[in-house]
Curated annotation (Swiss-Prot):
Organism annotation: Pyropia yezoensis
GO-annotated biological processes: translation
Entry-linked SUPFAM superfamilies: Nucleic acid-binding proteins
Source domain of life: Eukaryota
GO molecular function: mRNA binding; structural constituent of ribosome
Bilayer-spanning residue ranges: none
Keywords tagged on the record: Chloroplast, Plastid, Repeat, Ribonucleoprotein, Ribosomal protein
Sequence ranges assigned to domain S1 motif in this UniProt record: 27-96, 114-178, 192-260
Family note: Belongs to the bacterial ribosomal protein bS1 family.
Major location (coarse): plastid
Name of the featured protein: Small ribosomal subunit protein bS1c
A GO CC term assigned to this protein in UniProt: ribosome
């Protein structure tokens, strides 16, 4: 019933509809009323002489939805005009495609507004966190989790995030917890302020400092040492240090610190 018809074009579709003197095109959004349930789909009245059919797999993009539980006889709503089945002579409708289009529209708006989002965690993998935003699967890389510890106990819990990269054509949705944390604490993150934090990572290029829920970097060039070998002997993980805020990168959620500028 839902199999695409090879070789069937928009011109063929237009010819079929012209026969019935009805002005529709593939990709149109149409209003319709559900009037019958079938084994693998529902029949919908969209005001055309040609019957319209909504396959079960086109009901929703939400994988948690169970078949037709969200639909009822006499429900009137909008559908996406997906295809025309030559064999059954039915217009094929989709709610899933309509949800997808509208979800990306909302995501583009959220990106433009740089909104702080409360998003459900769906799981974790080696590279980071998997989330769901407006029905679209998204990803938070490890580098943008900040001090958040990955654990399955957080599945289906909510986390504050900000959008980092949105590419609708490639269905690529990247978010950042680090950006959200910087945004929430921005009123206290003033360049020149002295902060106190705990060293939680020592690298050849500097010290990573835990400042509340935030992670800041004291680059090696901003530490009062004469050579690189001194960094491991002078500092230990767990040490509490003071540093000066020298840069707040809200776009990438980065906090740059300096020990050279301490008075």
């Amino acid at each position: 019933m839902t199999k695409n018809n090879e070789g069937f074009t928009h011109r063929n579709f237009a010819a079929v509809l012209q026969k019935y003197k009805y002005d529709l095109n593939l990709g149109d959004i149409v209003a319709g009323t559900i009037f019958s349930f079938e084994l693998n789909g529902v029949l919908v009245d969209i005001g055309t002489p040609i019957s319209a059919y909504l396959p079960i797999q086109e009901v929703s993009s939400n994988q948690d939805l169970n078949n037709f539980t969200s639909l009822n006889i006499n429900d009137t709503r909008e559908f996406f005009l997906l295809d025309y089945n030559i064999q059954s002579k039915q217009l094929i409708l989709s709610i899933r495609r309509l949800e997808y289009i509208r979800a990306w529209k909302r995501i583009r708006q959220l990106l433009a507004e740089d909104s702080l989002l409360n998003v459900m965690i769906k799981g974790f993998n080696k590279g980071g966190m998997i989330i769901n935003l407006e029905g679209i699967s998204g990803f938070v890389p490890n580098s943008h989790l900040g001090n958040f510890q990955k654990s399955e106990q957080f599945n289906n819990k909510f986390i504050k995030l900000k959008l980092l990269n949105v590419e609708e054509k490639s269905n690529n949705l990247i978010l950042s917890h680090r950006r959200a944390l910087i945004s929430q604490a921005s009123s206290n993150l003033i360049v020149g302020n002295i902060i106190e934090g705990i060293i939680n990572q020592i690298t050849p290029y500097g010290l990573f400092i835990k400042v509340g829920n935030l992670k800041g970097l004291v680059h090696i060039s901003e530490i009062n040492i004469k050579n690189l070998e001194q960094i491991s002997s002078q500092f230990k993980i767990g040490d509490t240090i003071k540093a000066v805020i020298i840069h707040v990168d809200k776009k990438q959620g980065r906090l740059s610190l300096s020990m050279k500028h301490l008075r």
